[in-house]
Amino acid sequence: MAQFDLNDDSVVVIIGSGAGGGTLGNELAQKGIKVVCLEAGRRLGLGDITNGGEMFAKISWLDPREGSGDLDPNLPAWICKTVGGTTMHWAGAALRIQPHEFKALTNYGRLPGANLDDWPITYNDLDAYYDRAEDKMGVTGTHGIPRLPGNNNYKVLAAGAKNLGYKDYHTGNMAINSRERDGRPACRQIGFCMSGCAIGAKWSTLYTEVPKAEATGNYELRPESMVIRINHDARGKVTGVVYADANGAMHEQKARIVAVAGNSIESPRLLLNSASNLFSDGLANSSGQVGRNYMSHLTGAVYAVMPGEVNLHRGTQMAGIIK
């Protein structure tokens, strides 16, 4: 792994090592661009990952927060503080947003209390990028990659779907290896995918993008490095960041470009905390919308008591899909 000087202002600093930051860092490093990735959390190895609830204490962002608004700043937010970010705890379900979902306002109209709007882009605009992402991540059911075999949850789902006359049901599109690929093993259906994946079959930047970037010699990962502030010069051009290391010591890393990829809470917090005389409302906030309009990802769940033993904890979190 490369090591860059704190005063090297030719590097690109990326804040965060998850789906956005980890992937960006690898793409830049592969093209010969020098990258310093600052990650607030620590780096885990496969030996640190266990199949159990205790993993959430290892990977979750548990730091207490202070806020000035009416809402509780410590509201439950399933984000991670670890190398790999939320690619460590996601279930691996890699589904495309469907064409009709890009036109929510057109399709559903104005709804009381809702702020529905149409996307400024369409499904066709993203199609080629979806294709590239699915290939990079090894998404099952795409690029000739076989789907995962059905676990017991899926067998129950499929039997019910068949009895009801459905024809289109399968184990979904998952960024979890159904066969050896990209130097990682096939899924063994051991469950607890959202605890990090103990064998590395699930796509996570911890297992994929970060080590590939390090292998180029153009990438330095600094875990347990909490960015406090983004600095800029008198013209307003970003010049670097100030961060605290694992011991609380403060450092300034110079940079030619800073990419902020610290999830939906930490990114706006950092931008707002980087306010200055030149940018009194925080960085990148000419709209006044940074830190506003927070939207959570909703998930519906259904549980049922079955006549036979199912062992729902085994296998992937998403049993399957019925269309």
What are these model-derived regions, one by one?
Residues 4-9, 45-56:
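Accessory recognition modules or surfaces
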Residues 56-146, 307, 311-314:
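Redox-cofactor-proximal catalytic regions of oxidoreductases
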Residues 182-184, 232-239:
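A short, glycine/Asx- and small/polar-enriched loop/turn
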Residues 69-72, 107-227:
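Conserved redox-cofactor binding core of oxidoreductases
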Residues 46-50, 91-93, 101-102, 180-182, ...:
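Short, solvent-exposed loop/turn and secondary-structure capping segments
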